[in-house]
Amino acid sequence: MAVSSKHIPAPDLHRVRRALLSVSDKTGLIDFAKALHANGVEILSTGGTAKSIAAAGIPVKDVSEITGFPEIMDGRVKTLHPAVHGGLLAVRNDPEHVAAIEEHGIGGIDLAVINLYPFEEVRFKGGDYDTTVENIDIGGPAMIRASAKNHAYVATVVDPADYADVVAELEKHSGSLPLAFRKKLAAKAFSRTAAYDAAISNWFAEAIDEETPTYRAVAGKLHSVMRYGENPHQTAGFYLTGEKRPGVATATQLQGKQLSYNNINDTDAAFELVAEFDPARTAAVAIIKHANPCGVAEASTIKEAYLKALACDPVSAFGGIVALNRTLDEEAAEEIVKTFTEVIIAPDATEGAQAIVAAKKNLRLLVTGGLPDPRAKGIAAKTVAGGLLVQSRDNGVVDDLDLKVVTKRAPTEAELNDLKFAFRVGKHVKSNAIVYVKDGATVGIGAGQMSRVDSARIAARKAEDAAEAAGLAAPLTKGCVVASDAFFPFADGLLSAVEAGATAVIQPGGSMRDDEVIAAADEHGIAMVMTGMRHFRH
């Protein structure tokens, strides 16, 4: 049953006479404590926070002095006491509450400055189970929730970035804080505890291999606010989950304009794709527009791979995202800047390459320090009206699959290499996806069509356009291989690929008409390999 309210009006301005400071992150702590003292605020504190404040010569009272109880159990119990929570939760205009705190000698607390044990940091650094559990804060979230609930009389600060605003408001209002400001801080406080609990919940689900927990929490910390979202009439912000997977969220931006919503979405897609290619084996480049590849290629150098990728669809590559699986060097940079490019993302960039890119001031250059592991576990989430779709990350890798040759003719070694290449790319193309590949480069990509045969036809037409632009006598689909992200429901998609010039096919299989498709391949002397793994992408 819901708890009823006494409807006691909150004051607009509330004087801050007493503050409780208990922080794990001590950034800005001393300057903030000095400012509070200068504004006549009595400071209560705990453990290491109290020691830091006292060492700076600022008057501070240890919380054990008001509880009459020392810290116990390695600090697990220090603020879980009525003298603390009564001071945070007391409604100052309620006669019953006033009588209770007077009877029990509880002093009111007007400002709670709390930040939490670094659970998220420990989690993503791979701390062992016991260490991770020990970094679950109990008293901190309890104080944050108590003070934020009682924002009518208490201001709650959970982020050192807000210290300056608190001091400014105190000085502006002669030692008081306004209700609107206290509400704003309370909203942030509850968001913080929600995100913290979400991190704990998700870690526990992973720790016990619970793939579909009863309650699923997704949370992040605001990194940046964009000018707009996918379209100019939409608002947008970028939130970081704390996962250390190399990519756009963890990258260092060396130059260029702020990343837009679409930039981030496309850059993530590009870097995840190029990570499918082992940099110890080959250099690889992916060019992306609208989260779909315009061209992907591998070669002995990044420059060569870029030129091969660009040749697949030079028109669509204009204004695209370029992702590399190796360090950006001068030779590659000189080629990339010849075409208008929004973002370059790579594990690293040489000083010479940075100097070349610097000539294009708006071009964003991101370095990540590494590549994401395509085999790593993780989750992918998507909102729908009234719900959240959550699934495990598509971490299937073609090199790990048991490939089955189902036709009379087996692919040659060169065809098999290209087939694997094509299937890697197809995993990152919006369904229905058809990818033509020849000599380690895409030569035609058909994406996002409602029928597979249309994707095959579009990919072939793209190859024809690229050949015409390059002055070639015939499109490079002649003698190529083809990948399909899902099975061919009919033989028509396969026959379109054959018409385009494909000599070998890789697909998951699993259609009711697999026999018909295999027979059509045999009839045309096509080698076909089935993977048993589908890669739908929506």
Curated annotation (Swiss-Prot):
Pfam families: AICARFT_IMPCHas, MGS
Keyword Transferase: yes
UniProt pathway: Purine metabolism; IMP biosynthesis via de novo pathway; 5-formamido-1-(5-phospho-D-ribosyl)imidazole-4-carboxamide from 5-amino-1-(5-phospho-D-ribosyl)imidazole-4-carboxamide (10-formyl THF route): step 1/1; Purine metabolism; IMP biosynthesis via de novo pathway; IMP from 5-formamido-1-(5-phospho-D-ribosyl)imidazole-4-carboxamide: step 1/1
GO molecular function, one term: IMP cyclohydrolase activity
Gene Ontology CC entries for this record: cytosol
Catalytic activity: (6R)-10-formyltetrahydrofolate + 5-amino-1-(5-phospho-beta-D-ribosyl)imidazole-4-carboxamide = 5-formamido-1-(5-phospho-D-ribosyl)imidazole-4-carboxamide + (6S)-5,6,7,8-tetrahydrofolate; IMP + H2O = 5-formamido-1-(5-phospho-D-ribosyl)imidazole-4-carboxamide
The enzyme's E.C. designation: 2.1.2.3, 3.5.4.10
InterPro entries with a match to the protein in the record: AICAR_Tfase_dup_dom_sf, Cytidine_deaminase-like, MGS-like_dom, MGS-like_dom_sf, PurH-like
Classification via SMART domains: AICARFT_IMPCHas, MGS
PROSITE patterns in alphabetical order: MGS (PS51855)
Domain MGS-like: 6-158
GO biological process: 'de novo' IMP biosynthetic process
Keyword terms, alphabetized: Hydrolase, Multifunctional enzyme, Purine biosynthesis, Transferase
Keyword Signal: no
Domain notes: The IMP cyclohydrolase activity resides in the N-terminal region.
Family: Belongs to the PurH family.
Name of this chain's protein: Bifunctional purine biosynthesis protein PurH
Organism of derivation: Brucella ovis (strain ATCC 25840 / 63/290 / NCTC 10512)
